[in-house]
Amino acid sequence: MQAPRLWWVSGPGGMVNPQRDHLLSTADFENIESSESWMDLPNMIDFIDWKIHFFDFAILSALQVDRFGNINTVVVGDRARPKVRGPGTVGISALCGLAKRFYVVLTRHDKSAFRPRVDFICGAGHLQGGDSRERAGLPPGGPKLVVSPLGVFDFEPQSKAMRIRSLHPGVSLQQVQDATGFDLLVKGTPPVTMWPTEQELNLLRTRVDVRGTLQRKFP
């Protein structure tokens, strides 16, 4: 509907355009049964190469995200004695560095998820802000948006610091700032995130997410 010619490559599994009646993990090999094609890991890495730019964008999640859009899926706390051990980088380093842009979607919004600095950078955002990403030798692009249960956030063009793009209906500016571990940039009164249309909801409920997985993740 929004992107009729979209190609979906199912993460580390390498499945292209799997057609399922319910959502599975991107690494679940059940996806291969309905996929148009499949790529092994070496071919996946070749497609991510910045000279090819096969991937227009990636959609990722994380344990932590910081004010410059760096993400962490590895550990929470000291790497030697972590409080939480995550799934690892699972290709995120390559996608954040070499896809044209990426989007971060989180199922929670609190100070443990929105950190001044992530405990471990496994996906490079705007690093220390400003032009630090380009100075590190990474191609331009990086994080475009962060979406949480409280709002939508983008990055100020010069400083590359996270700012409020919109707040979800019923969410106050104070509420989102209190739930964030750093000061979010804000210009004026943030607009309210638009409600999905009836057509969009119908598509989600009858084609994309028949079993209501998203409703359980985002109550």
Model-predicted regions and their roles:
Residues 17-199:
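Conserved phosphate- and dinucleotide-binding cores of soluble alpha/beta proteins
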Residues 6-14, 106:
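Short internal beta-strands
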Residues 189-219:
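Acidic/aromatic/glycine-rich contiguous surface patches that form carbohydrate-binding/processing clefts
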Residues 1-4:
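Glycine-rich loop at the start of a catalytic domain that most often binds anionic cofactors/ligands
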Residues 10-13, 122-124, 211:
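Feature targets compositionally biased, intrinsically disordered low-complexity regions
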